[in-house]
From Swiss-Prot:
This is 3-dehydroquinate dehydratase. Gene3D superfamilies: Dehydroquinase, class II (3.40.50.9100). Its EC number is 4.2.1.10. Homododecamer. PANTHER family: CATABOLIC 3-DEHYDROQUINASE (PTHR21272:SF3).
Length: 154
């Protein structure tokens, strides 16, 4: 069974409480459980991990090496600051999609730059929790293309 990893960065554990006018009222647990059920219904395994510290996220990315097929990541504020998370994602060579609940381009100027976007398969922002659903759909679509290619070549 193909495995997808959902990573969430700093302060996302506060979803549902933190600035609901920006981030919505769903909790991270609500999102994780919904995505896990959606993935399982389509024959995929979804693991999830949230950390407020950069080191923990980097270590989890490293643990994904050779046992994870796709990463969905909302790096939170590390989007705009972390070359280290970028380097970790490049080191493991696992395709990933970047997700943001809010439209980072409609917010403060310092949020407009991402250290991940140019190496991600795609970026979804501003669609609230629904963005995670779209990211999962994309991840599954990409994995199905890979599986189809493997079947045709082997």
């Amino acid at each position: 069974m193909k495995k997808i990893l959902l990573l969430n960065g700093p302060n996302l554990n506060m979803l549902g409480k933190r600035e609901p006018h920006i981030y919505g009222s769903q909790t991270l647990s609500d999102i994780e459980q919904h995505l896990q059920q959606s993935a399982q219904a389509q024959g995929y395994e979804l693991d999830y991990f949230q950390a407020n510290g950069e080191e923990s996220l980097i270590n989890r990315i490293h643990q994904a090496f050779q046992n994870t097929d796709f990463i969905i990541i909302n790096p939170g504020a590390f989007t705009h600051t972390s070359v280290a998370i970028r380097d970790a994602l490049l080191a493991v060579s696992i395709p990933f999609i970047e997700v943001h609940l809010s439209n980072v381009h409609a917010r403060e100027p310092f949020r407009h730059h991402s250290y991940l976007s140019d190496v991600a398969k795609g970026v979804i922002c501003g669609l609230g929790a629904k963005g995670y659903d779209y990211a999962l759909d994309f991840a599954i679509s990409e994995l199905q293309k890979i599986q189809l290619g493997e079947m045709m070549n082997g």
